[in-house]
From Swiss-Prot:
Domain of life: Eukaryota
Gene3D superfamilies associated with the record: Glucose-6-phosphate isomerase like protein, domain 1, Helix hairpin bin
GO annotation, cellular component aspect: chloroplast; small ribosomal subunit
Protein's name according to its UniProt entry: Small ribosomal subunit protein uS2c
HAMAP family: Ribosomal_uS2_B (MF_00291_B)
PANTHER family the record matches: 30S RIBOSOMAL PROTEIN S2 PROKARYOTIC AND ORGANELLAR, SMALL RIBOSOMAL SUBUNIT PROTEIN US2M
Pfam families: Ribosomal_S2
Gene label: rps2
Length: 236
């Protein structure tokens, strides 16, 4: 894997609050190598390590994007949801930002059935088919469509399992991470000081509670994905 320069600056990360971890009582001892200090009862993340692993993750997704690989970004908590949707939409990645439905990946056949139903209902709505149904039936299908849009809207174009999954909060998205581990899907995780750095293929130590921190990390990753896709087009 070729190493590239991704314009990752410590000052920029400090401004975004990437270095602020959790309280010192709420930590995972395995995060010790990624912590540089304690300040006012809070662990401070070593941003040099963050920059190293973020750069490594950018190299990985760039190379994967040049080969046409598919990405899924997962971040369902309120502080992450908007940033996840924007970053994914900008680079045509799949995303889950509302709720992780159990078995979304490990029980892919069920997810695929739901996606087919979702596409059929969207087609019916666009062609006016729902309006030709009795009111009660139309209302029921519209409720189904709304529910599917909420939970599957970000993966509506997904036709198979993703090649790489980017996870914003390891603890919040633990079920998603476990499904990836079960299936052998490579993962990139933002990990705060209360996480286990050994669970993901690449763990990026960072504040996973601040919107600015989440946005900065995601923006670097999706920029690398976008660059990889552009490189693939130029070289084809």
């Amino acid at each position: 894997m070729t190493r590239r320069y991704w314009n990752i600056h410590l000052e920029e990360m400090m401004e975004a609050g990437v270095h602020f971890g959790h309280g010192t009582r709420k930590w995972n001892p395995r995060m010790a190598p990624y912590i540089s200090a304690k300040r006012k009862g809070i662990h401070i993340i070593n941003l040099t390590r963050t920059a190293r692993f973020l750069s490594e993750a950018c190299d990985l997704v760039f190379d994967a994007a040049t080969r046409g690989k598919q990405f899924l970004i997962v971040g369902t908590k309120n502080k992450a949801a908007d940033s996840v949707a924007r970053a994914a939409t900008r680079t045509r990645c799949h995303y889950v930002n509302k709720k992780w439905l159990g078995g979304m990946l490990t029980n892919w056949s069920t997810t695929e059935t739901r996606l087919h139903k979702f596409r059929d209902l969207r087609t019916e709505q666009k062609t006016g088919g729902l309006n030709r149904l009795p009111k009660r039936d139309a209302a029921m299908f519209k409720r189904q469509l709304s529910h599917l849009q909420t939970y599957l809207g970000g993966i509506k174009y997904m036709t198979g399992l993703p090649d790489i999954v980017i996870i914003v909060d390891q603890q919040e998205e633990y079920r998603a991470l476990q499904e990836c581990i079960t299936l052998g899907i490579p993962t990139i995780c933002l990990i705060d000081t209360n996480c286990d750095p050994d669970l993901a293929d690449i763990s990026i130590p960072a504040n996973d509670d601040a919107i600015a921190s989440i946005r900065l990390i995601l923006n670097k990753l999706v920029f690398a994905i976008s660059e990889g896709r552009s490189s693939s087009i130029r070289n084809s």
